């Protein structure tokens, strides 16, 4: 899949397609050596993205430098193996997907990409920063609970978060 804002150009996505034969999945990265950022994200978005990635890596032991880049490609076999088990939407969807795939032993390559921040994108991180950061953090916490002995707590957790969001 690729994000609809076209931050990852079709040519860069084509590079992922070329490599899918070597693995079960290929993800684009803006953070590794060889990546080209035509136009960087604004500071707050970079800060939030980096913090989210570091927290996701620490909480789930993921080896990827950029879990949130919106260009990923997986084999049908890999997706079919984990799709019924995925429990997260919102911000931690990518983390959930990558975590499930790595736990099942699927090989995922992370490749540098050419990426351009789209200033006109409908999602304005700066305007939503103080609302997004807690939601991003809570998405990771919920996912961590799903993969812990405390997974039964998730229902109560979901009810609590639902009440907080309605306020």
Where are these regions (language model features)?
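Short beta-strand-to-loop acidic/aromatic patch adjacent to the donor-nucleotide binding site
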Residues: 1-7
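Conserved residues at the C-terminal ends of beta-strands
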Residues: 2, 29, 114
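Residue-level signature of catalytic and energy-coupling elements of molecular machines
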Residues: 5, 26, 75, 101, ...
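General alpha-helical segment detector with a strong preference for membrane-spanning helices
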Residues: 7-9, 33, 98-100
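Acceptor/aglycone-binding surface of glycosyltransferases and processive sugar-polymer synthases
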Residues: 10-91, 118-137
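Hydrophobic helical membrane-anchoring modules
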Residues: 15, 61, 85-167
């Amino acid at each position: 899949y690729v994000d609809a804002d076209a931050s990852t150009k079709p040519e860069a996505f084509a590079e992922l397609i070329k490599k899918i034969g070597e693995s079960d999945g290929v993800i684009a990265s803006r953070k590794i050596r060889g990546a080209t950022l035509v136009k960087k994200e604004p500071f707050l978005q970079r800060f939030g993205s980096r913090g989210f990635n570091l927290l996701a890596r620490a909480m789930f032991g993921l080896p990827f430098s950029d879990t949130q880049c919106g260009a990923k490609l997986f084999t049908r076999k890999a997706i079919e193996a984990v799709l019924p088990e995925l429990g997260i939407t919102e911000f931690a969807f990518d983390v959930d997907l990558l975590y499930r795939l790595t736990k099942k032993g699927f090989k995922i390559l992370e490749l540098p990409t050419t990426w351009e921040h789209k200033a006109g994108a409908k999602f304005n991180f700066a305007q939503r920063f103080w609302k997004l950061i807690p939601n991003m953090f809570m998405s990771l916490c919920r996912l961590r609970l799903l993969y812990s002995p405390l997974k039964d707590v998730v229902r109560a957790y979901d009810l609590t978060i639902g009440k907080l969001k309605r306020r």
